[in-house]
């Protein structure tokens, strides 16, 4: 899937592997299968533990992992791998259960929040008049989960301020997702005679 959170996790994992670290990823499966496998992401091989999931009808690619037994499955992976830290990407399903499993094994947990409740509403089945209430509930739930982290980050300072205000958390670190600017550098000399507009927005 092409989205900011997925690309962030992919680049971070790939960068850690290239620096010699052992990285394990826990993520929903693309189909109804499950279990560990070797996958190539960001140009490197890594172990991905896939969780059984189901397609969300109102989204082209989003899959919803089965919650039944998820904590136990994640706990089994953590017990076998014994990571130095667990890094979750949201307070929702996988992140929530990973936190529970990690805490029981006294592992450090870091979270990078990518979730914006406003962006979830367009894929919900709720009537529009309920969206403000739903967003308030999601933010409150996010705060309840994210306050349990050993460290909490977001990609930008503005996102950190928003998270602290909306989810009532503190000490959020703004750490950029990082972009390899050399991949986008233009080797052809240019001038400013023709105006160029660049739009940066969501693909979905």
PLM features per residue range, with description:
Residues 29, 158, 178:
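Carbohydrate-associated surface elements
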Residues 55-59, 111-140:
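Acceptor-binding helix/loop patch of EC 2.4 sugar-transfer enzymes
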Residues 74-95, 99, 105-110:
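Short N-terminal targeting/anchoring amphipathic segment
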Residues 85, 102-123, 153:
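Active-site proximal beta-strand in glycosyltransferases
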Residues 176-185:
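Short beta-strand->alpha-helix junction loop in the catalytic core
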């Amino acid at each position: 899937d092409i989205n900011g959170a997925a690309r962030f996790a992919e680049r971070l994992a790939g960068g850690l592997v290239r620096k010699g670290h052992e990285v394990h990823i826990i993520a929903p499966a693309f189909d109804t299968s499950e279990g560990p496998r070797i996958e190539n992401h960001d140009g490197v091989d890594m172990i991905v533990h896939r969780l059984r999931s189901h397609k969300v009808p109102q989204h082209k690619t989003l899959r919803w992992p089965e919650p039944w037994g998820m904590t136990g499955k994640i706990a089994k992976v953590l017990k076998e791998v014994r990571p130095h830290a667990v890094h979750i990407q949201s307070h929702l399903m996988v992140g929530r259960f990973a936190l529970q499993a990690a805490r029981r094994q006294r592992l450090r947990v870091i979270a990078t929040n990518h979730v914006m409740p406003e962006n979830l509403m367009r894929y919900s089945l709720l009537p529009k008049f309920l969206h403000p209430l739903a967003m308030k509930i999601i933010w409150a739930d996010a705060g309840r989960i994210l306050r349990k982290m050993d460290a909490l980050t977001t990609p930008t300072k503005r996102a950190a301020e928003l998270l602290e205000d909306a989810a009532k958390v503190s000490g959020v670190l703004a750490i950029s997702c990082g972009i390899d600017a050399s991949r986008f550098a233009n080797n052809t000399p240019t001038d400013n005679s023709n105006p160029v507009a660049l739009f940066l927005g969501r693909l979905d």
